[in-house]
């Protein structure tokens, strides 16, 4: 599903925003891009929003096959699932992007936006294939997956990457839920304190936010709005940001 956002600029060549879980957030995000692309407070140019739909989020967005729960425990009767993120990445780049660029006036600048499992996929794509997109917006990424396997993998490969010219906005819902045991909060701190500094050393521009009034199920839209606002604020040139 495609929608051309309105605004000033070259109507023939536009940036493309790939929105994972597009069936949930498509219309809202189209509204956000139309607002910012026509606002004097933003440098966001008119862009094309591509809603990316899938039939199995666990399979498509997770890096490993795992039975571990959100608190890190494993029950013997839970069946392992997931592990198809790299296959889905190849579909996204080798098939979907080619189809999009054959149908719409794209200019070669691309954004990837994801929440939850899709936020984890967004971070993994940045870590493994930073050249694939120009800006990444990862909302409350499911770092707990497979007992924090993403952080383990990222710690090994970020040293080999160059993130020059790339931008990451990452946000976490930090409202406490006492009845639920999670390893997510400690992993989010590890991302901030260990992985992100190494990515910055490799020239990645990072904006890290916490939303203390939001939980996992409510953070997506306010954080996507804030991500677009923060990355494209009119007083900041994203080409010069460090």
Please give the residue ranges for each predicted region.
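Serine-hydrolase catalytic machinery in alpha/beta-hydrolase-like enzymes
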Residues: 16-91, 95, 99, 103
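Cell-envelope and extracellular/periplasmic
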Residues: 19-25, 101, 126-127, 135-141, ...
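Short glycine-enriched nucleophile-adjacent loop
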Residues: 33, 119-130
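Alpha/beta-hydrolase fold nucleophile elbow
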Residues: 104-116, 136
């Amino acid at each position: 599903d495609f929608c051309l956002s309105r605004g000033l600029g070259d109507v023939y060549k536009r940036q493309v925003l790939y929105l994972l879980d597009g069936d949930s957030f498509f219309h809202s995000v189209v509204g956000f891009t139309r607002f910012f692309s026509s606002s004097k407070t933003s440098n966001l140019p008119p862009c094309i929003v591509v809603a990316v739909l899938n039939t199995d989020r666990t399979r498509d967005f997770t890096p490993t096959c795992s039975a571990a729960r959100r608190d890190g425990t494993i029950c013997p009767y839970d069946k392992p699932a997931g592990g198809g993120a790299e296959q889905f990445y190849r579909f996204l780049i080798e098939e979907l992007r080619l189809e999009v660029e054959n149908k719409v006036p794209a200019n070669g600048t691309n954004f990837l936006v994801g929440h939850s499992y899709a936020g984890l996929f967004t971070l993994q794509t940045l870590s493994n294939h930073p050249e694939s997109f120009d800006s990444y917006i990862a909302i409350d990424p499911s770092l707990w997956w497979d007992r924090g396997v993403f952080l383990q993998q990222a710690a090994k490969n970020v040293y080999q990457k160059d993130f020059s010219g790339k931008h990451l906005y990452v946000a976490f819902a930090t409202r406490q839920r006492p009845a639920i045991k999670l390893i997510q909060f400690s992993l989010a701190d590890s991302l901030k304190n260990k992985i992100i500094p190494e990515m910055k050393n490799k020239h990645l521009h990072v904006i890290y936010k916490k939303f203390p009034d939001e939980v996992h199920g409510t953070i997506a839209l306010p954080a996507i709005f804030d991500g677009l606002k923060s990355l494209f604020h009119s007083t900041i040139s994203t080409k010069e940001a460090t």
